[in-house]
Structures are given as C-alpha cells and as structure tokens.
Amino acid sequence: MRRTFTAEEKASVFELWKNGTGFSEIANILGSKPGTIFTMLRDTGGIKPHERKRAVAHLTLSEREEIRAGLSAKMSIRAIATALNRSPSTISREVQRNRGRRYYKAVDANNRANRMAKRPKPCLLDQNLPLRKLVLEKLEMKWSPEQISGWLRRTKPRQKTLRISPETIYKTLYFRSREALHHLNIQHLRRSHSLRHGRRHTRKGERGTINIVNGTPIHERSRNIDNRRSLGHWEGDLVSGTKNSHIATLVDRKSRYTIIVRLRGKDSVSVNQALTDKFLSLPSELRKSLTWDRGMELARHLEFTVSTGVKVYFCDPQSPWQRGTNENTNGLIRQYFPKKTCLAQYTQHELDLVAAQLNNRPRKTLKFKTPKEIIERGVALTD
C-alpha cells in the first residue's frame, strides 16, 4: 500500500535532507522507501516549501481525520457535519472528491487539497518578462543566481523592476510547479544536481600527496600574500579528465583572474615547461608567488622558480582549503569540462575562451566587479 505523509513528516524529510541525511537513512527513519523520499524532494529540488496558510473556511487535517473516523463508525454525512459544525454539503463534496465513503483517507485528502489550492500570487519571473529574459541569458552564460542578483543591483541601481534575490531564482528553477524557468536550466548551474544539497552533504576525500623536496610550506608565506593586498600571487592545481588528460588552472588571489593552461602530460617535466612558458608571458608585476598542493607534478619547483622568479609555496597534506580560491574556481571550470571529459581534445584557444567567460563574470567577493576589471585596473596584461 502506498505510504502517505503528514505535514509534520514532510517537514522532517526536508529538515533531514538539509542536514545531510541520505535517502536511505531518511526512508528508514520514516518507514518508507528511498525512491519515495527522492520523489517528494524532487518536486521542489530539495528546497523546503513555505507552509501554506489555509483559509478558515477550508477543512483542516484534524477535521478530515474526524470525517474518516465518522465514516468508519458508519455515521451519516449530516451527523458528521453537525459534529464538526460544518455544512452537510461541504462534508459531502469532501468525501465524494476523495474516493467516497469506502476509500476516504484523511492524509490523502489533505495532501490533495494542498496540491489543488491556487498559489496566492504569480511567480515574479512570470510577471516580469524583461527580468526573466535577463536572468535566462545570464544563466546560459553559466552565471550563478547570486552573480545575476548582485550584477543587477550594481549595474541597474535605479531600475527597481530589475531586482531579484538569488533564492527566488533557485526556487523558480527547482520548483516544478513554477514554469517561468524550465527546470532543465539547472544544467547551467555550477553543480547541476536535480536536488540542492545542504552544506553538510558528504564529499569524497582528496587525492594522495608526496613529500616535496626543499618545498617551502604555506605557513612561511608573508602576511601581504595572505591578506590579498597585491596582484601576482597565484594559486594553482591540475584538473584531470579521461584518457590521462589534464589542464593546469591558475587563479590570482586578489583579482580572482583565471588562467587555464593546456598540458601535454601530468609529469613534472611537462607541467614545469607549460607553467614556465605561461608565467614568462605575464608582466613582471604578475609574477610574484604560486601556491600549489603537494602533487608530484610540481616536483621541479626549484627549476620553475629559477626560470620565472616566482616563489612556490606548498599546502599541508590533505588541506585543499588552503588554496580555496583555486578549489572554488576548479568547480566553476567543471561546468565547462564535466568529469569523464577528455581534456586533450581542447586547444589552448578554446581554454582561453572559457577563462575569458570566467573573468567576465561578476563576483560577490569583488562587490560584483569582474576579475578582468580588477586586474586591468592594476596592470595591463600582455598576450
């Protein structure tokens, strides 16, 4: 028999999901099936919907439970109506629209009433077509809802009709009852999951590390680097694809300016040569330091420093947050190059186009200016 849920049980499902509990565990707690839990969460993308306020004239769940009890006791419709101080016609319509006297169920009837109730007001993006067009254009450029919202506030401060919160964009994407933005546009988000995950959602561990010879630890970086006060201090890492393909990613700590470098291989010789060539193409003002993890690919860091003048600092083992700017940027890059993509098929020009898109996205941490604006204000980049 199909499992039905009370409003309290539904609320607990969303709360458990928000706290990082998986489908199977939630199902065990509520005595249900994982697929049922997924279906419930899917309709709103894992976002807990606001509790609907019912009009006084509408039947409540407790009244529906009394109707069910009265029907089981073979009471007449009129007797049930008298006990509830309701009109007999109200009780009669309620029973008939919910499978009749024999099969009436209070929880099912209440859930159906909630589904059938009209939304109190139209969705913002249903009403505002110019705003919807702008939001959709930016989503297709892989801007996040937060970037879209912040950019509108910064660039169109006097146009109050072009204001929207990030959460409204998320809800319009994920709530399937809202059709202003088709839910398939979720694919443009950084993480195109069918459900939004809570902050406590589990993640897989990081890859192994090696002992770097003569490597300078990150704790010896100057305060000036840590405080992001000047350009030219970079964080870097590799992003890997199928068929042993790799690219190197570099992010300036102050401006968040991104560079993507095509690699012939992951070995230290190939990586050292590619990074050396790239850094030597930059003006000296942008060649100050590089923070990397403890991967084998930068074992020739001393040669790199001699060739470029760029000091290399290494993170602690299993500590990706120590170069969090680069980790975040790699997540953005994965929008363009999902896992199981062969990265060798892309030319340097194509990688540069992706970097250009990232560098022209407004960032909240930059007060919704773009990395390109910040770095061009500090120094003119050369080709």
From Swiss-Prot:
Which protein family is named in the record?
A: Belongs to the transposase IS30 family.
Against InterPro entries, the record matches this protein to: Integrase_cat-core (IPR001584), IS30-like_HTH (IPR025246), RNaseH-like_sf (IPR012337), RNaseH_sf (IPR036397), Transposase-Integrase (IPR051917), Transposase_IS30-like (IPR053392), Transposase_IS30_CS (IPR001598)
Q: Which domain of life is it from?
A: Bacteria
Could you tell me what this protein does?
Required for the transposition of the insertion element.
Keyword set for this entry? DNA recombination, DNA-binding, Transposable element, Transposition
The coiled-coil segments of this chain are: none
Q: Which Gene3D superfamilies match?
A: Homeodomain-like, Ribonuclease H-like superfamily/Ribonuclease H
Keyword check for Membrane: no
For this entry, the protein name equals Transposase InsI for insertion sequence element IS30A
The Gene Ontology CC terms held by the record are: protein-DNA complex
Q: Name one GO molecular function term.
A: sequence-specific DNA binding
